[in-house]
Amino acid sequence: MAVKALNPKAEVARAQAALAVNISAARGLQDVLRTNLGPKGTMKMLVSGAGDIKLTKDGNVLLQEMQIQHPTASLIAKVATAQDDITGDGTTSNVLIIGELLKQADLYISEGLHPRIVAEGFEIAKEKALEVLEQVKVTKEMDRETLIDVAKTSLRTKVHTELADILTEAVVDSVLAVRKPGEPIDLHMVEIMEMKHKSETDTTLIRGLVLDHGARHPDMKKRVEDAYILTCNVSLEYEKTEVSAGFFYKSAEEREKLVKAERKFIEDRVSKIIDLKRRVCGDSDKGFIVINQKGIDPFSLDALAKEGIVALRRAKRRNMERLTLACGGTAMNSVEDLTPDCLGHAGLVYEYTLGEEKYTFIEKCDNPRSVTLLIRGPNKHTLTQIKDAVRDGLRAVKNAIEDGCVIPGAGALEVAVANALVKHKPNVKGRAQLGVQAFADALLIIPKVLAQNSGYDPQETLVKVQAEHAESGQLTGVDLNTGEPMVAAAAGIWDNYNVKKQLLHSCTVIASNILLVDEIMRAGMSSLKG
């Protein structure tokens, strides 16, 4: 052992031992996530060192929050979280398939097959699997109904069914609102706002914006209908200079002059806004609202309140962009060239007070290009759970629109691919066939676990589904309510195409990499110090 001679403290695991260590790590991770695949999966409760509780069913959240010691397990966890970052779904399946690929490969390797040959078989199988994926994808018009099915499939695996059905519509409508033809969809234009009250089923989509602060002046109206909205980034307060400068005055009068000049400078700005308001509103009842990114001092607030203008100060930067998209108009950086064209319009603006906090709702916009999902829930972990789910739901809808096609879900794809691989096996040269067989068997973990989590017998269900698939030639998945086979497409259970594609790629690559490890050395520089 060369390493031992050089560094007696090094820990080394060779050939079979190294493989055994890696495979047991993958299986350990698989066992943890196994029970929360699919809509009937179970919850996991994570308690941090500080006693914070997190209830989740989302594989991604679990993997990020769990403290994973084992190097191989953390490698698999990283792949799965990367899958989530890219596509927003498929983390649990990812871990399950990698674990299962290694488990199947282990059967052959323990009989003396070289890991390299298994890895070659995996590679051949992956190419074939991607071909099958291309054949079975369903290209269809992404109308609202299809998108609702896609979002529902994703959301039901994250939160319970009744809530998923409520969230689905909100999620789909919000993506359709911010979508511009021919441009990539920017999900940042959907603001996700949390309010801690009522119950989670009160989560709604607001076609406009919700700001998390209210007006700062007692005389300003709490509710304005049919309002013009001016978004601006102009300071309406006396600001100190950026460098700390001091003035020496010859006399008190000069100081007065300076103060007056500063005051006038700001008053001029305010009066320009007031002029614009008079021009567009005249004597009518229309409201006028100023939303400013910088500060507004009490004098200016007073002047604006007298004119019946509602002013909000210190809005967030990202909300400025959303405001102009939601209500139209342009954001102004100076008050010199204010014209009626730069104003947006909203049908209703009102302030809502919840406990200590104030929220300003801007609703009934004419053609909102930016919307807000208002998530309500009784406590913090419910809110976090819904927020995670909504993010993934938004991503699923976005993927479906951008792919222009979907894949039947409920384990149907996996059954079809496994079937195609078994047929394809005789065309593969030599011992690599065993790798193909291992890949085919490994994919079947998905329908098996789906059935198992719903309380059915995994083997029996799988055999039924395979028989049905062979007979009808249609993509057949598991009906989780009855445990019988069903045509996934007819039931409206759709998965994202790019999630599955990414899944096949990343699982194969990582499983092959782990198989080909034949030495694990813990011999970093740090261990020499001891």
UniProtKB/Swiss-Prot annotation:
It comes from the Eukaryota. ATP binds at residues 38, 90-92, 410-411, 495, 500. It is an enzyme of class 3 (hydrolase). It is found in: Cytoplasm. Keywords: ATP-binding, Chaperone, Cytoplasm, Hydrolase, Magnesium, Metal-binding, Nucleotide-binding. ADP binds at residues 38, 90-93, 157-158, 410, 495. GO terms for cellular component: chaperonin-containing T-complex. PANTHER family: CHAPERONIN. Component of the chaperonin-containing T-complex (TRiC), a hexadecamer composed of two identical back-to-back stacked rings enclosing a protein folding chamber. Each ring is made up of eight different subunits: TCP1/CCT1, CCT2, CCT3, CCT4, CCT5, CCT6A/CCT6, CCT7, CCT8. Interacts with PACRG. Component of the chaperonin-containing T-complex (TRiC), a molecular chaperone complex that assists the folding of actin, tubulin and other proteins upon ATP hydrolysis. It comes from Gallus gallus. One of its GO terms (molecular function) is ATP hydrolysis activity. It catalyses: ATP + H2O = ADP + phosphate + H(+). This is T-complex protein 1 subunit zeta. Mg(2+) binds at residue 89. Belongs to the TCP-1 chaperonin family. InterPro entries: Chap_CCT_zeta, Chaperone_TCP-1, Chaperonin_TCP-1_CS, Cpn60/GroEL/TCP-1, GroEL-like_apical_dom_sf, GROEL-like_equatorial_sf, TCP-1-like_intermed_sf, TCP-1_chaperonin. Its EC number is 3.6.1.-. One of its GO terms (biological process) is protein folding.
